[in-house]
Amino acid sequence: MRSTPPTRQRVSRPRVALLSTVLWLPVLAITALGCADCVRVAGAAEAWPQFMFDACHSGDAADRDVDPERLGLVATASLGDAILTSPVVAEGRVFVVDGSGRCGAFDAATLAPLWSHVTRGGPQNVNNVASPAVAGPYLHVAAASGWHTVLDRATGAVVRELDLAEPVMGTPLVGEDRVYVVTLGARVHALAFDGTPQWTWDFVREVVGFDGDRWSGAAWLAARGERVTWKDHFVSSRDASLFGRTLVIPAGGRTVFLDDTGAASRLRAVGVIPGYDGNEFPATFGQSVDAAGNVYVQWHRRDNAGRTDILRLEGDEARPAGVVPGTETNIRMEGLLSFAPVAIRDGIVFRTRPQQGRGLCRHRPDAAEPEVLSERPSVAPPVLTSRHVLHAGLDGTLDIVPLGGGPATSLGTGGPITAPVAVADGRVYVPCEDGRLYLFAPEPRAVPRGTSAASAAAVTDESTTPPPDLTTIRSPLTGPRAGAEHDWYTNYGNFAGQNANDQGLEPPLRMRWARRLEGTVKHLPVCGGGRLYTHTAEGQIIAVEQDTGRLLWRRHFPDVFLSFTSPAYVDGLLLVPQAGLKRSLVRCLDAATGALRWEAPFTGSPSWSRQFPPVVHGRVAIYASGSGEYAAQGSEKFFTFGGEPVPAPDDREVMSFIYSNDNPYYPRDHRPRVWAWDLDTGKLRWERDFSEVGRGGNDCGLCILDGKLYYSVFFGYDAAARARRGLPAGANGLTACLDPLTGDTIWQTTDHYVTSKCTLSGRDGRLYIGGFNRARAGTDDRHVWCLDARDGRLVWRSEAVTSALNVVSVGERFLFSNALRGRGNVFDRDTGAVVHSILTNYACCRFTLSEPYVLGANMDMIDLSADGRLVSTGPAIDSRECLGAVVSNGRIFYTSQASGFVVSQTYGPDSAALPPVWEVRPQR
């Protein structure tokens, strides 16, 4: 991978620094031939009418220019919430919408406020990511509340309000004489510029073949009679595109081509991404169309597997037209996914991703490897001008990179930038998650270079609204289970690893809120302090309100690589293990603000199974992993997860970072390690190395029970093979009881241990151990073991099971474990006998137990008290089956592994009392 010369920093930035920026583009007119023609009347102000400049979302503004050397910070304007949308510009005014649905109009030269309008929905109208769009004299604003508002952009007066009855997360598309709006539920609304409805079209009805309530699990169960699958996936959470009079819509993992025939619509084709690392419908994370009508789809199917494919409409068929070189990713490659639309010019693709060292790349059709233009991680689409590409980073910095080579100019803001910038008349408008819109322009009143952006914002804020305190919870949880004792505060619910609770769960289930996520996740939702926390595999840590999903803060740390690890909430702190090929750190953050308290190094790879974060006893945080050397692809078969091994120099044993589930042995430099740090300072309290017993360490588990620390680790099932390799052959694994304050061993046994892809759990003086591998060579049987926590003595061994994946869930009434592509089993807690089984046949689903129900992928709800009867299923918002839902504080929370989506549901009586914002009418 080639790189451009290093970035030239314009200013120092303690947290944020002074900016200078980019360009802007002209008013656009959609033609029947392509995306748009950029037309400009002599002397008229330039316009940037919609997201990524044109309705194709090509990001290509070739006739615009900026002079980075002359740009300075002229003004900022504060709204009431984080800005997650792109600004638009028309006739000397700039318009932007914040996360809470407030639309502000400002003078384009000064950011002096002109008018503002709050869209309908009240306090629940949050998670607004749909950018506004200019259509003639009107401004179209689509809201998460399900209201679509048409405003007079000169005065802010309401021209029309349309109740679309479900959220909108994609920007309105402005065509020649129409505006198109696609809802989250994949309904398409065609409107006149003034908002007069023209026609509607429904993907769920016409393509999926479902006529019921698409947001109701009971309705899906009644219609299907079984659980929903990837074939029922339907949501449209990303931005659609428009080419001439053909809409190109990402919906349910497919690409829909829909013609506007005037009085109605006509379905042209439904495009499907070819099979690659699976055949299920993938998630679209970004979509763009070039001037020739080629559709660029950035997609993800599973576990970092994705790329940018090109689809082309030929007649009434959508055909694959190639893959953008250098965009392919999977678990055997060092690259991370992209989560944004690409920008395109003359067949050359500009693409961002949240990966340090590869943040912005240029992909030429004749080059196998991309060229790195900026190392800065990003989830925002790039924007092209005549001589530069504008690249917005998760660290709040805007890079203006010369297309012809040479150093970039870097400009700072006060928070992450997650939406594309707008450019007009040589000015650059930057939306920021600190709640401000930044204006950089070649003006004499620009803030002197060297001024920090935080200070500059304070003296240049033209808004009458004070800077918002974004981290404050505005809609706190209420109800009898809102207290901390009902928090699901770590991946397995509590530090005993029980993966179970009883919070009165009962049908019916009802949607409460939905939000978009620019990342992939392998852990369960974690809650505490009224917030829900998410750690993406690419290194973002995100906190949102539990009641509404409103963004509170976002932090990104570089060099995190496929870290499928969970946060843990304890006493106002958040502990997050962040692993990577270059370095791995446990980080402690202030849970209320995201401020870093301390960080401490660890080694090894979490791989598939070690999702758990540290456990905490008193003021001691304890974590376990392995050590050793890693690469994206390992050096021999049993160190890899598919693909051809890559031999290492000097016959070194190198493990894949995401390695095999078949583990006869581990590399000789893998040492099982346990660390303990002071929770308040991060100072190392003690450390243990169990390599005298065996080699391994990454396939392990921890739990705290009755004031003791329990640790279990797998060394591989084949003792003879280990002996031939010169490794300790005496034990296939270890389970130990330790003093959590000192690390001293109280007892240990090598008779019973986790066998990978599983942690251990404890309750009522007993430990429960499972796993995916066989325990020893010569048998294919797997078992669940129950040990006496006092001395490690075996209490019972279950009958043979397919596997016991992730964790043995230990409730007050039920003992449950899941199997990979097999039966989930309910065990008698006194004998280990299988009481009954449920044919879940999921992949690696992380079930949870909220008695008497287990919760699976797509919010599946299975009643263990009724012999595994399926009670509710769907909506199918994810095409993968890796994660289940959790019940915390009287609510259900679900994060999709593959589709970049987070939802909350209510249940029982609350399902009537706490409806989603898009079902509450009227709202004013």
Predicted segments, located by residue:
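Short loop/turn segments that connect beta-strands within beta-propeller blades
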Residues: 107-111, 152-156, 192-196, 259-263, ...
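Repeat-blade elements of multi-bladed beta-propeller folds
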Residues: 45-55, 80-103, 120-149, 162-189, ...
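Bacterial Sec signal peptide processing site at the extreme N-terminus
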Residues: 36-44
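Extracellular/periplasmic ectodomains of large secreted or surface enzymes and adhesion receptors
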Residues: 433, 441-494, 501, 897, ...
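N-terminal secretory signal peptides that target proteins for export/translocation
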Residues: 1-16
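Blade/loop signatures of beta-propeller domains
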Residues: 44-72, 475-511
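A short beta-strand motif characteristic of beta-propeller blades
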Residues: 72-77, 112-122, 157-162, 197-201, ...
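Bacterial N-terminal signal peptides
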Residues: 17-36
